[in-house]
């Protein structure tokens, strides 16, 4: 277990910034719904789902002007016996940070560092938004990239829009005898989790708790669903997607070992593009990837242009930031070992570890 020295407590409210309470819930929901900068992860549904499923307390810092919310910063107090503590915006998300009037970013960032001290978190991580530039903050602009592209007018045009080499892979997959189902019931959830758990085990990383997927599906309602590709009635690829303001984001997806030969993952993403268009979406948000990683180049092969993302981190004096980067050299041997674990053991132990990787 990681041990940290006590961090001095500090007053929180200042510069028109305060910690939201239960009475602010309706105001926060309205602000997020009306704010052009808000992502799916800024929605209160995400904040509550992560807290409910994994126990990471959700907090919202409010910057107010004239009695109205001008900007806000949602955060999770992430705790793990293996990876330590951190105040993160936002837990298990690829986006986060301040939304609203960017003039309040500095004050909200300062308040976040004071909240971190109060919660004994030695670091604060902001995954997007206008970033603070004060003492102790470090901004990275080259570690991750986002990938978003418009959806085509129909299925044929969508296939044609895929670059030639990748389009050939999709065509090979479509020629195989596979079926696709979309839903969010118990059967869809069970198939998705089984496929996803095997997929991440094969990559050498622990699987998130099943409760997290269920909580997100329950909280988002019709704004989340599962698309599964089946071969001989067995699930071989599956993805849980989020829908937000005309964009679909395939968020948790993967395939079993057999999926590669079947090109099931290629079929999965193509069919999701077509399905999203029938739901009224006009954009496909492929999410973020670490720069120059395998996923980064996979998305480029689909014709998506990388857009650099800016993240910020603050660390208390004398404290070390947590390291949850799976590409870190310190985890190389552990990843190789995890890939060899029997699936039953990986699925039992994995959620106990991955719950702290928010």
List where the protein language model places each region.
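Non-catalytic accessory segments adjacent to catalytic cores
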Residues: 103-148
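Short, high-confidence coil segments that cap the C-terminus of an alpha-helix
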Residues: 56-58, 118-121, 279-281
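A conserved beta-strand-loop-helix scaffold within acyl/acetyltransferase catalytic domains
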Residues: 7-8, 15-66, 73-83, 128-146, ...
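The substrate-binding groove and active-site-proximal loops of carbohydrate-active enzymes
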Residues: 95-101
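Conserved acyl-donor/pantetheine-binding loop and adjacent beta-alpha core of acyl/acetyltransferases
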Residues: 78-95
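Active-site/acyl-donor-binding loops of N-acyltransferases
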Residues: 2-12, 77, 133-157, 282-358
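Aromatic (often tryptophan-rich) hydrophobic motifs at membrane interfaces
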Residues: 62-66, 72, 93, 106-115, ...
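A short, structural micro-pattern
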Residues: 69, 92, 118-120, 140-143, ...
């Amino acid at each position: 277990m990681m041990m940290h020295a006590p961090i001095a407590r500090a007053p929180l409210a200042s510069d028109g910034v305060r910690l939201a309470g239960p009475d602010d819930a309706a105001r926060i929901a309205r602000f997020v719904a009306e704010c052009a900068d808000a992502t799916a992860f800024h929605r209160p549904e995400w904040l509550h789902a992560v807290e409910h499923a994994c126990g990471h307390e959700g907090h919202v810092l409010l910057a107010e002007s004239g009695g109205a919310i001008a900007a806000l910063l949602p955060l999770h107090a992430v705790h793990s016996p293996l990876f330590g503590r951190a105040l993160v915006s936002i837990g298990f998300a690829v986006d986060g940070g301040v939304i609203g009037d960017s003039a309040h970013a500095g004050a909200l960032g300062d308040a976040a560092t004071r909240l971190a001290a109060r919660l004994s978190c030695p670091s604060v991580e902001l995954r997007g938004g206008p970033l603070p530039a004060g003492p102790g903050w470090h901004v990275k602009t080259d570690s991750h990239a986002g990938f978003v592209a418009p959806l085509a007018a129909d299925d044929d045009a969508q296939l044609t829009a895929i670059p030639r080499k990748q389009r050939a892979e999709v065509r090979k997959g479509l020629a195989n005898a596979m079926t696709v189902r979309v839903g969010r019931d118990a059967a869809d959830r069970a198939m998705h989790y089984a496929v996803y758990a095997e997929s991440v085990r094969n990559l050498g990383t622990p699987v998130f708790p099943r409760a997290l997927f269920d909580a997100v599906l329950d909280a988002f309602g019709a704004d989340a669903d599962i698309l599964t590709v089946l071969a001989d009635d067995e699930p071989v690829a599956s993805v849980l997607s989020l829908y937000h303001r005309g964009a679909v984001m395939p968020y948790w997806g993967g395939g079993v070992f057999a999926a590669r030969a079947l090109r099931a993952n290629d079929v999965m993403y193509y069919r999701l593009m077509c399905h999203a268009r029938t739901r009224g979406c006009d954009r496909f948000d492929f999410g973020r990837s670490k720069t120059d990683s395998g996923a980064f180049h996979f998305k480029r092969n689909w014709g998506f242009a990388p857009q650099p993302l800016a993240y910020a981190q603050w660390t208390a004096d004398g404290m070390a930031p947590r390291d949850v980067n799976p590409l870190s050299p310190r985890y190389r041997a552990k990843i190789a070992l995890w890939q060899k674990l029997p699936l039953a053991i990986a699925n039992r132990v994995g959620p106990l570890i991955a719950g702290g990787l928010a």
